[in-house]
Amino acid sequence: MEGDMHINSDLRNLAEIDRLVHEPARLMILMVLYTVEVADFTFLANATELTDGNLSSHLSKLEAAEYVEIEKGYAGKKPQTLLRLTTLGRQAVDTYRDTMRQALQDLEE
């Protein structure tokens, strides 16, 4: 019975997981940005293997949540889009990682 309370608590934590982060394409984007200081759009598209349109759509959602900062500019005469994980985005990834880690550890017990 006592173990049931522990399981219910863990399930509740999973039920409250950030769905914006949990979506596979956005999770890939966030993982790449977590490991680099800044990435350009082309690098991120290649790293995630998402189409430009799909990547752009997911980035818009992450930007609206203030998880990602999008900076548009030029490299010489060519347009360039630079992407950074915000402090809030980094915190969201950390929270997601910790929640998933705990849930997976509890499976082993």
Regions found by a protein language model. Name each.
Residues 12-54, 75-84:
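N-terminal helix-turn-helix DNA-binding core of bacterial DNA-binding proteins
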Residues 85-89:
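Accessory beta->alpha helical hairpin/"wing" motif in late/C-terminal subdomains of nucleic-acid enzymes
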Residues 70:
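Short beta-strand "wing" residues that participate in macromolecule-binding interfaces
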Residues 66:
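Glycine-centered, phosphate/nucleic-acid-interacting loop/turn motifs that mediate DNA/RNA or nucleotide
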Residues 58:
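Residues within the DNA-recognition helix of helix-turn-helix
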Residues 2-14, 31, 90-109:
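Amphipathic alpha-helical dimerization/coiled-coil segments
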Residues 61:
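Alpha-helical DNA-recognition elements
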